C-alpha cells in the first residue's frame, strides 16, 4: 500500500515544468489514515463514498455511462440511502440524457439534484427530474430550457424520418417536463420554443427546482 511520503514523492517526480499552468488539469488526491495504514483516492472516488455523483460538461454517451454506473453501484451499496447528483452542464445528447433519466427513475434510492453553475438543455431536464422536494440550485446558478436540437441531410425520405423522430422527442420531453414541474404541456411547449434562461429563483417559481440553497442545511 502506498504511503503518504511515497505518494508525494511520486507526484513531485512526475510534475512537469510550468506546473502552475498545468495544475488545473490534475485531479486532487486525498490520503486517508486509519489503523490499517494510509489509502489514497482521487477526489471524485472519495466523494462517491459519500454518495455524491458529478455530471459536469457535455452530456454524451461517455458521461451517461459513468453516471449510470455510479448510480447503479450506489444502489447496490445501500438501496435505502439518497444519492446526490451535482450538475454543471450545458446539455448535450438526448439519448444519453434519457439513459441517465431512466436510471434515476429506475433505481430504488431517491436521487437529489443540485445545480452549481449551469444546467442547460438536457442538464436542466435532469435537474428537474430529481426526487420531488430534493431538487436544489445554488443562488448564482443559471438554468436554461429549450426544445431539442437536430439536423438531417440526405434523401427527402431520410430527412422526413429524422423530422418525425425529433418531433416525437420534443413531445416526449415536454410531457415529462410538465410532469416534473407541474406546468401544463402547452406552456412548456411555448416556453421551450427558444432558449429560455432563468435564475435559480425563477427556476424555483417554474417548478424546475424546489429550493435555492444559500448554505448547507
UniProtKB/Swiss-Prot annotation:
Record-linked PROSITE patterns: CLP_PROTEASE_HIS, CLP_PROTEASE_SER
Please list the residues that make up the active site.
121 (nucleophile), 146
Enzyme class comes to hydrolase
Main localization is cytoplasm
A Pfam family (short name) is CLP_protease
> Where does the protein end up?
Cytoplasm
| SUPFAM superfamilies registered for this protein in UniProt | ClpP/crotonase (SSF52096)
EC no.?
Answer: 3.4.21.92
Reaction it catalyzes? Hydrolysis of proteins to small peptides in the presence of ATP and magnesium. alpha-casein is the usual test substrate. In the absence of ATP, only oligopeptides shorter than five residues are hydrolyzed (such as succinyl-Leu-Tyr-|-NHMec, and Leu-Tyr-Leu-|-Tyr-Trp, in which cleavage of the -Tyr-|-Leu- and -Tyr-|-Trp bonds also occurs)
Q: Does this entry carry the keyword Cytoplasm? A: yes
Family to which this protein belongs: Belongs to the peptidase S14 family.
What the entry lists under PANTHER family is as follows: ATP-DEPENDENT CLP PROTEASE PROTEOLYTIC SUBUNIT (PTHR10381:SF70)
What subunit structure does UniProt give? Fourteen ClpP subunits assemble into 2 heptameric rings which stack back to back to give a disk-like structure with a central cavity, resembling the structure of eukaryotic proteasomes.
HAMAP family documented for this protein: ClpP
The molecule here is called ATP-dependent Clp protease proteolytic subunit
Amino acid at each position: 500500500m502506498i504511503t503518504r511520503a511515497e505518494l508525494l514523492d511520486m507526484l513531485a517526480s512526475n510534475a512537469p515544468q510550468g506546473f502552475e499552468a498545468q495544475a488545473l488539469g490534475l485531479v486532487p488526491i486525498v490520503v486517508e489514515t486509519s489503523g490499517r495504514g494510509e489509502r489514497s483516492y482521487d477526489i471524485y472516488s472519495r466523494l462517491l463514498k459519500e454518495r455524491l455523483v458529478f455530471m459536469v460538461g457535455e452530456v454524451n454517451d461517455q458521461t451517461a455511462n459513468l453516471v449510470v454506473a455510479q448510480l447503479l453501484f450506489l444502489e447496490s451499496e445501500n438501496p435505502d440511502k439518497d444519492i446526490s447528483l451535482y450538475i454543471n452542464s450545458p446539455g448535450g445528447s438526448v439519448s444519453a440524457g434519457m439513459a441517465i433519466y431512466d436510471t434515476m427513475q429506475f433505481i430504488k434510492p431517491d436521487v437529489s439534484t443540485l445545480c452549481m453553475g449551469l444546467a442547460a438543455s438536457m442538464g436542466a431536464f435532469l435537474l428537474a427530474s430529481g426526487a420531488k422536494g430534493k431538487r436544489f440550485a445554488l443562488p448564482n446558478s443559471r438554468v436554461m430550457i429549450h426544445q431539442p436540437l437536430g439536423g438531417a441531410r440526405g434523401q427527402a425520405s431520410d430527412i422526413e424520418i429524422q423530422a418525425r423522430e425529433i418531433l416525437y422527442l420534443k413531445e416526449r420531453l415536454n410531457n415529462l417536463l410538465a410532469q416534473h414541474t407541474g406546468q401544463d404541456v402547452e406552456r412548456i411547449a411555448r416556453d421551450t420554443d427558444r432558449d429560455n434562461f432563468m435564475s435559480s429563483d425563477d427556476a424555483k417559481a417554474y417548478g424546475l427546482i424546489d429550493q435555492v440553497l444559500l448554505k448547507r442545511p
